[in-house]
UniProtKB/Swiss-Prot annotation:
The keyword Transit peptide applies. Residues 127-233 form the Bromo domain. The NET domain could serve as an interface to localize different proteins or complexes to chromatin. Transmembrane segments: none annotated. It is found in: Plastid, Chloroplast. GO terms for cellular component: chloroplast. This is Transcription factor GTE5, chloroplastic.
Length: 487
């Protein structure tokens, strides 16, 4: 009688069997004792070549679980011995990396290379790009299923159609079927290459066929359809690559400090001409014609400070307009002024402002018509382009006002700053602004001033005539009184 421990199905039982002396334990079918023995790496043969080992495959289903456990224990013990030997030779080496070099885990190396260590692994790692290519495939499928796309789904058979001059005009033939094949084989490095081939297909048809031809009209229709659908895919691609831009920009912080000292001295040079008297003489010729064409009648000395302010601000604005050449950052005052000017623009000019902003922010085209603008979030080039647009509009507006006799916009601003609550009355060519204190500043043309002078002289003569008349009446009255007293 002998006992055997049998395990299976999660439970263990002890059974007694009768065995004769001649009987042996049943062996697994198909696997001999020699086949079960696996050569293990030991200290004596760890550096032997693979030819010295007899690598045999073991079917785990043909042996018992107890033998599997024993086999695992032996393999683990041998593996620990190999790792200890590797650490003795190279203590700083990584055990996993050293074992990969020694050939012990040669099977794992095959698995790594077999899972797509080439293009598939790199292409699959970028999930965003894979999704974009899927969107490209769906867009191409819609184009090919269109009722007018049958002409472009296959290459042009120039010989069969008798188009002998086709290849002379069309240098690079392309069709949607070829694009589909290249997209399926992952031959496009980026979605932009896919878009170029689709455009090339329709542009070739537009180039070869005359205007009004059916193929010409089909090509225009499908090209417009593609461009409408491509906008969203292109935005996804731009947003995906924009996320990785900060990692590239981190490599360039070193040159920034060297550029900063060059930009900082510029603001220090700009305010210097305002306090000193010698620098202002060059700019006055620009503002001098404006002052010569306007004659100011000042009733009090309170209005005198208005004139130097208009003269001083002229060179500052000239320097500000020259500043964008250096692409410097706008100052806080310039940003505040730009924000105010943008709010004061008429509705027809806001469309141009939106187009300027969309150049650096293409994703705004997919949003609502209402755009919330943050001046600080815009880049330098966009800010300067907006600044030049606003200043150009103001200059054109001031020229129109001068042509109609309303004076320059800068003069109007300086007068507006010196008067708290102006009330404007316009009659003919004379404009008067009345302050709270009742003082008035009048602006008139030279011809009007001459008329005023002639009017004042006539009023003076009339006053003298009235004076003479009054003197005659006084003399008559005095003579009358004398005669009465005599009587």
């Amino acid at each position: 009688m002998s006992s055997e421990h049998i395990s299976g199905g999660g439970a263990s039982k002890t059974k007694k069997h009768k065995w004769s002396s001649s009987q042996n334990r049943p062996k697994p079918m198909g696997v001999s004792r020699q086949e079960r023995s696996v050569p293990l790496v030991s200290p004596s043969n760890s550096f032997a070549s693979e030819d010295d080992h007899h690598m045999l495959k073991i079917s785990l289903s043909s042996i018992s679980k107890l033998e599997v456990r024993n086999l695992k224990r032996k393999l683990k013990s041998e593996l620990d011995e190999v790792r200890s030997l590797i650490k003795r030779f190279d203590p700083e080496a990584n055990p996993g990396g050293s074992m990969a070099k020694s050939g012990v885990v040669g099977r794992s190396k095959k698995v790594k290379t077999g899972n797509g260590g080439g293009k598939k692994s790199g292409h699959g790692a970028d999930k965003g790009t894979v999704q974009i290519f899927k969107n490209c495939n769906s867009l191409l499928t819609k184009l090919m299923k269109h009722k007018s796309a049958w002409v472009f789904n296959v290459p042009v058979d120039a010989k069969g159609l008798g188009l002998h001059d086709y290849h002379n005009i069309v240098k690079e033939p392309m069709d949607l079927g070829t694009v589909k094949t290249k997209l399926g084989k992952s031959l496009y490095k980026s979605p932009l290459d896919f878009a170029e081939d689709v455009r090339l297909t329709f542009n070739n048809a537009i180039l070869y066929n005359p205007i009004g031809h059916d193929v010409y009209r089909f090509a225009e229709l499908l090209l417009n359809m593609f461009e409408d659908k491509w906008v969203s895919i292109e935005m996804q691609y731009d947003n995906l690559h924009r996320k990785f831009k900060p990692t590239r920009d981190i490599e360039f912080p070193a040159p920034a400090p060297s550029i900063a000292p060059i930009v900082e001295p510029l603001p220090a040079i700009v305010p210097s001409p305002s306090p000193s008297s010698p620098p202002p003489p060059p700019p006055p010729p620009v503002a001098a014609p404006v002052l010569e064409n306007r004659t100011w009648e000042r009733e009090e000395s309170m209005t005198i400070p208005v004139e130097p302010e208009a003269v001083i601000t002229a060179p500052e604005k000239a320097e500000e307009e020259e500043a964008p050449v250096n692409n410097r950052d706008l100052t806080l005052e310039e940003k505040r002024r730009l924000s105010e000017e943008l709010q004061d623009l008429p509705y027809d000019k806001l469309e141009t402002v939106v187009q300027i902003i969309k150049k650096s922010n293409p994703e705004l085209s997919q949003k609502d018509d209402e755009i919330e603008l943050d001046i600080d979030s815009l880049d330098i080039n966009t800010l300067w382009e907006l600044y030049r647009f606003v200043t150009g509009y103001k200059e054109s507006l001031s020229k129109k006002n001068e042509a109609h006799g309303f004076g320059s916009e800068r003069d109007a601003e300086s007068v507006h700053n010196s008067i708290q609550e102006p009330t404007t009355l316009v009659s003919g060519t004379t404009t008067s602004r009345v302050t709270e204190s009742g003082k008035a500043i009048r602006t008139s043309s030279p011809a009007r001033q001459e008329n005023n002078a002639s009017g004042s002289s006539s009023s003076n003569s009339s006053s003298s005539d009235s004076g003479s008349c009054s003197s005659d009446t006084d003399s008559d009255s005095s003579s009358g009184r004398g005669s009465d007293n005599g009587n």
